[in-house]
Amino acid sequence: MLRVTGLKKQFEADRGASVAAVDNVSFEVETGKLLTLLGPSGCGKTTTLRSIAGLEEPDGGEIQIGSSVVFSATRRFSLPPNRRRVGMVFQSYAIWPHMTVFQNVAYPLEGSRVSKIEVRKRVEQVLALVGLEAFIERPAPLLSGGQQQRVALARALVAEPEVLLLDEPLSNLDAQLREQMRVDLRALQQRVGLTAVYVTHDQIEALAISDVVAVMSAGRLVEIGTPHQIYDWPKSRFAAEFIGAGNVVPVRETQSVDGKSRGRVPWGEIYFSHNGQTIPKALVIRPEDIQIVSCSTKDNVWPAKVDQVVFLGAIYDCRLALGDMTLRAQFPRSAGVEVGQLIHVHVHETRCVPIEE
């Protein structure tokens, strides 16, 4: 289990000013679960991760790993990194080129009271976990990028950490290998029952690998939830636009009609699902939830003009003109849409998601 409470970290900027890299961030990771810190560059996700590892000294807050508090600003207490029972996989992998695979993986156990026989046993076990047991004596320079990533993961696991920390570990791999490693890493985490915190700016990666996604922006935790919750029911404009490129549409004159919520959008009338007490200011419509229909005999059907079509293999990524707004839509290749085509589109009311900002 990992608990982060009220974490704060500031860095000095130009002319003596300070920047809040991490601003009152709190979250908890249950034992055996993987939480991803997701956000753009400079949002504070890596600083948060490094604070958990003990590589950054926070200015405020508390960090608890298992039953032990490893950092407390109020108590002025900070446990050294080597005593925090964490393993870390860096973005650069940090594989030593003058060592073999065995020497790289065994390095965290140097200076410990673990016997040579036990060291060998542990290294063989973690290499088997990552599928590299046959490479144990191979020199590090002879490893591929994917193999180096696996060695870095094995090294992080060999000391049997309570929490595994991963700082964009797949970003240096090509697209196809990155996708395969994503699957393998998730399978390993679930099989071993690792408690893990994963940092990435890749939205697809975060959705695919996580039990919980924590969205960060400008040092703050904007939103937290399961991948389905974050994607299907975002609460903030930032989360809606950053994950999945949702269309954020202003809505006004909202009212309840026959148990449904109705409002005005720039191109006309719209029905949407809304069970909250507050009045929404905007609706989120995902590109894949926009469907082409043959007529306008039901609710939420509007005329649209196809302004742009980009072929992406399995889908067409389109820009549609509805009134004065442009919406992004994704259609199957069977739709056969063309630039300039006039169509009717439909969005089910349950896929028009209200947000308050």
Residue ranges: model-predicted function:
Residues 38-40:
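The feature captures the beta-strand-to-loop junction immediately N-terminal to the Walker
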Residues 232, 259-309, 334-357:
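Glycine/charge-rich catalytic "coupling/switch" loops of P-loop NTPases
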